[in-house]
């Protein structure tokens, strides 16, 4: 999905609210069993996916995210793979990210 999304970070102790604005897309394996189950269109599962991503990003402060974006990426990917199948969701793409 090419929509721009906003996620809140965990409080960092500076008294300010910090957030991530980005686009998120999923790379899918069209040959997987999951593809046969869910197809190319995960829109019916969008709310579940976004809730998972929101929870994960909310576990990190902005500083933690900026220091180790790959940890956040890996946690999101592993969570979605566990839910939908590792052979189906092969990557999570966080694009045009802006933190504030």
Label the model's feature ranges:
Residues 1-100:
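Flexible, low-complexity charged segments
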């Amino acid at each position: 999905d090419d929509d721009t999304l906003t996620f809140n970070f965990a409080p960092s102790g500076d008294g300010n609210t910090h957030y991530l604005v980005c686009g998120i897309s999923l790379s899918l394996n069209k040959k997987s069993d999951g593809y046969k189950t869910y197809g190319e269109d995960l829109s019916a599962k969008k709310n579940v996916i976004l809730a998972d991503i929101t929870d994960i990003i909310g576990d990190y402060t902005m500083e933690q995210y900026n220091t180790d974006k790959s940890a956040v990426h890996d946690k999101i990917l592993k969570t979605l793979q566990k839910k939908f199948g590792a052979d189906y969701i092969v990557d999570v793409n966080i694009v045009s990210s802006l933190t504030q």
